[in-house]
Amino acid sequence: MDFTEIHKRSRRKKFQQIHQDRKDEMIQQLGRRFHNQPSTSATYPSAVEDIPLPSEVPNVFGAPPPLTNADFHRNFLVDPDVVVSHSASLIRSNRHIVKAEDAEQYMMVSRERVGTTAERVLEDFNSRVIKPLKAKRRLQIDVPYIDHPLHSMRSKTPERKENEEDSDSEIRSSDSSSDAEYGSDVEEEPDSCRRKKRTHKIQKADSSQTKVEEKERQNTLLRMGIERKRNHPNAIDPHISYNEKGLGNDSPECRCPFPIRNRGLKHGYYAGENQVLKCSKNDRANLHYYTLHVTPAPNESQIQKTQMLINGMEYHFEGFTMVTHAPLPDCMTRRPVFKYSIDYEFQLIEEFMPTECFDPEDCNSIFEYIFHDIFELLDFDLYPKHLPPGTASCPTIHIVPRFVAMENNTTFIWSSKTVLAFFLLHGKNNMFSPEDVEKNCAMSDDAFGRTIAKLKQSIVLNPMKKPSALRADWFSRDLENKEMFLIQNTIRSQNFASPFLPQIAALEKKMSRLKQEKKDSGNKNPHYENLKAELIVLKDKHREARQLKLKLPVKDYIDTGLKPDVVAHVAMAIIASHHIRYNFSLSVFEKVIEYKFNDRRIVELALIHSSFRSYYGTTPDHVKNMISNCGYRKKYGAEERREKKKGIISLFNIMGGETSGGEPILHNERLEYLGDAVVELIASHHLFFILNHHFEGGLATYRTALVQNRNLAKLAMNCRIDEMLQFAHGADLINEAEWKHALANAFEALMAGVFLDSGIAPCDAIFSKAMYGKDPEMKKVWDHLNEHELKIEDPLGDRDLSRITPALTDFHRLEQIIGIEFNNIRLLAKAFTRRNVPFNDLTKGHNQRLEWLGDSVLQLIISDYLYRNFPLHHEGHMSLLRTSLVSNQTQSVVCDDLGFQEFVIKAPHRKNDLKMKDKADLVEAFIGALYVDKGLEYCRSFIRTVFCPRLKHFINSEKWNDAKSHLQQWCLAIRDSRNPNPAMPEYRLLGIQGPTNNRIFRVAVYFRGERLSSAAASNMHTAELKAAENALAALEKASFSRMREKYMSGRQHRLHRIFFS
């Protein structure tokens, strides 16, 4: 057993031990966090008696304490820069570049080398290299593809009918025998309801059976696709993957229905690519040249590189030049925002290139030869797809190989003619002729090694095989039969499963069961060690089975002249091509929305769907196969294992800021979280001022209609977001409902991006144009906002009234407390006028409309603060923090701290007692009045100063988690990781008591069919929260009992089982 295997096995055991330790301490951690005790995860108790019992806490989810001077340790009005993944702006190079005339003459003048001229090199290349290659490729046997069904455009979950009852009602109404004591309080269900529920159960069972059958059918088709590739007559080996047009390693790359195949980035349709592109030798000066710089250099620390020695100068392959027909946008990002699973990055550098070095026809032939004929990237196409079929056009980007040499601060670069001559020199003949094979077989071993050393790690090509191109690691010979073979050391494809995997899985399951029996009984099972040894042997065999050594005859193989360093440049060129075309599309998009981004990184992020995890610019399997078959060889098992980020402990650590480092979140869900608040405020603002006589209930109804996904999806399509959204090429967004939901989220993310880039005003303009751009009259009504009625009466302010009106004079003291002076002090008075106050000419009504508006303002400013200051938090984490900050409890504390109760304008003969909800409404109404009088910036300063310092309390005490969420996380922590549908807490209504104006709801919480606790309250939500708190207290006591049992010795463990079980 080698050292690598020992190291890997020890590392695997280390991760298994870490996972087991985390699982063992999880419930103890949850109990500690529930009661806000200091961490005990660093060291375990030394004895059972040292484990602390939980303290009795009546209510752990209380309001935050009042603010002190220590809470203002930082300036909450100053934000860090918005975290993005890459820096922007293009780089311009100042290198002195000239054409390598000597190299061109050397390659073409000598008849022994190429035997052509600069005028005839393209013709000779096509006739002596391309034509024979395509003729040989046509000799391959055409095996029909496996016919896979297209993805369905219907929704995976059928829409509910309006009269169809929710499944939760069935869960809540169905009760066990333990609920009999409350059975008299619940009315008996009619027969029609029972029939509907039985029908629903039958339909659900049929749907589950259909899903199982569909999954089995898909697995069968996948296996058939894999077997087809394994048994292909032209495959060089059953365990080596190869590329075919439109096909991945196991199934077709695109299974989209025909109606949607002519749209979207995933099908190669880029916005704005609807013009015929033509360039010729005479137009070369109007083209734009950008060097694709790949870091780290692919040939760094490598012996074998793509290079050629000419007249004492060493020309090496530097990468590719990307030639475009228009200059790249000035605000274009250096690199794309999305991720790709390749260990390289690239930058586009604007650089001068001699016009005589570029010829469009030469470059098109070189591109076809490298990308399609050698590496078989058959789905990679640079021609615009919006043009009618048969329309002749240049590709959107010309990709030119760069061979350079440096001398005296001057860079000499090959022309496209010289590159053609290079490939003609290597590709016109086979790598070894029969005479060469016979000569090499007659050599001594030392001479043979020196002869073929220069061919080591060459990329060789045989167009009659699949894959056509391979990396030749070494060459061997059969002296008896006078034959030569190329050797490649590789790894079998993961699609071709090892026969040892089922046996390994069965043994691991059996060992896990024996380990649990040993833990329970304390007796060692004699079969355990035998199974462990057998498992080690099987894993060694599995490892050996993954490794593969190919030995192929050299007949019909040609040397392309390329080495594995070219592979990384090719992969980066594909991604860079998408990046360039996408940024040209963004320029069209900016014209549509009539807004130019200062930083395009934010709009790129806003248009990346969460399914878009990694992208290669073409079929992912094609790029992976190219890297595996032709790239530098990687050691098997050398990849780093990343720690999983899921789990309740990780959640608490993230929320508490205890994570070190972290990767940026490269999709639009964080922006969608912020954009939801932006869109809500825009809609609230317009409705508030347009419908100035509508009550808050009607305004809320209209706002719901405006911000619903159906409407936002239409606005997204009006902005052509459907042409710009980047998402995975699969079945996720095929059906119409999910597609519209994704468009709505993308529109909200776009609003957030514009808000972060320039503020709320451009967001308002884009929303207005998207909503009513096709109806000028309606757009005029939407854009024309009336002033508030109190401001209309006194356009210059009404502070003079406070001198003669005692009711207004009292608010001067409040202005001194908060440090803000209102222009219209009657607005401030209206914010403190409750609903039960009769209508009067002073305030013109109560504060409910202002409270409705202030809620939207508060949501946006808190969301903006969390987005900017917690860049590594997901949208779910930020939602938890926002909920804790804008809750009624927090707002009631703010109301008490600022003394708002003293200034409430109440009705005559009414008590001044305010409930928690009343105090919260008072704060929101004040924010609404401040927004109407002073604008968003004053609200931002007030909310950042009053609310945001309290966030530290919620983070440190971990009270951002309510009881129901906490109980759900507890149940998830003890789930079986192999179960895709873990059990969740169920809340059931046991009974309703009392008159209609004073109802008491009794609720019980169940887990895995057992009741955990019950509680009663005046509404369902509060009753569920109390039931969850009671369940947590009971579960915590039980968890500490189990932890004590864990630290017992074997004898103590058995005695405990005997006496206490």
From Swiss-Prot:
GO terms for biological process: cell differentiation; gonadal mesoderm development; pre-miRNA processing; primary miRNA processing; rRNA processing; sexual reproduction. It catalyses: Endonucleolytic cleavage to 5'-phosphomonoester. GO terms for cellular component: microprocessor complex; nucleus. Pfam families: dsrm (PF00035), Ribonucleas_3_3 (PF14622), Ribonuclease_3 (PF00636). It is found in: Nucleus. The keyword Glycosyltransferase does not apply. It comes from the Eukaryota. Its EC number is 3.1.26.3. The record marks K917 as: Important for activity. This is Ribonuclease 3. Executes the initial step of microRNA (miRNA) processing in the nucleus, that is the cleavage of pri-miRNA to release pre-miRNA. Involved in pre-rRNA processing. Cleaves double-strand RNA and does not cleave single-strand RNA. Involved in fertility. Required for the function or synthesis of the let-7 miRNA. SUPFAM superfamilies: dsRNA-binding domain-like, RNase III domain-like. Residues 962-1037 form the DRBM domain. One of its GO terms (molecular function) is metal ion binding. PANTHER family: RIBONUCLEASE 3, RIBONUCLEASE III. Residues 156-173 have a biased composition (Basic and acidic residues). SMART domains: DSRM, RIBOc. InterPro entries: dsRBD_dom (IPR014720), RNase_III (IPR011907), RNase_III_dom (IPR000999), RNAse_III_DSRM__animal (IPR044442), RNase_III_sf (IPR036389). Keywords: Developmental protein, Differentiation, Endonuclease, Gonadal differentiation, Hydrolase, Magnesium, Manganese, Metal-binding, Nuclease, Nucleus, Repeat, Ribosome biogenesis, RNA-binding, rRNA processing.
